[in-house]
């Protein structure tokens, strides 16, 4: 377990740009593959940990039945793999962390949307842009 944690931290440290400005990702497919092997156990465990947390956000029942539980877990895992690919773009990392650390207050939300809906809209926006960035920079090149 410690070995996986060290490799994951090394992967994250090399993936993050040194400057605060966002820049194009210059990592090779080979380095991404080795980084993914190191990060996969971390992302998988985080996926299970976030599963219950996001149940409240998405208003899902805590008692999952077989298929729905696995679908939800692996869907979250897929989204976090997209985030792992996007981690070398500091803008997305900054926005992602800021959104997850926001205290949800009624004064911060638009008047016609509840806070939970607004929170989901922001996260969906980030995931969509991460996916577009992934396709543009990795799948089409």
UniProtKB/Swiss-Prot annotation:
Disruption phenotype: Growth defect under alkaline conditions and citric acid stress. The chain crosses the membrane at residues 38-58, 67-87. GO terms for molecular function: ATP binding. ATP binds at residues 15-22. Keywords: ATP-binding, Membrane, Nucleotide-binding, Transmembrane, Transmembrane helix. It comes from the Eukaryota. It is a multi-pass membrane protein. It is found in: Membrane. Induction: Repressed after alkaline pH stress. Required for optimal growth under alkaline conditions. This is Uncharacterized protein YEL045C. It comes from Saccharomyces cerevisiae (strain ATCC 204508 / S288c) (Baker's yeast).
């Amino acid at each position: 377990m410690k070995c996986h944690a060290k490799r994951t931290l090394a992967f994250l440290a090399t993936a993050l740009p040194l400057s605060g400005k966002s820049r194009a990702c210059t990592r090779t497919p080979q380095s991404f593959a080795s980084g993914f092997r190191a990060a996969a156990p971390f992302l998988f465990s985080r996926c299970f940990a976030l599963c219950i947390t996001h149940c409240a956000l998405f208003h899902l029942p805590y008692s999952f039945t077989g298929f729905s539980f696995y679908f939800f877990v692996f869907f979250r895992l897929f989204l976090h793999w997209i985030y792992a690919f996007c981690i070398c773009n500091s803008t997305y990392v900054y926005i992602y962390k800021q959104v997850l650390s926001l205290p949800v207050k009624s004064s911060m939300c638009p008047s016609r949307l509840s806070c939970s809906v607004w929170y989901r809209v922001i996260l969906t926006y980030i995931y969509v842009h991460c996916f577009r960035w992934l396709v543009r920079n990795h799948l089409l090149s």
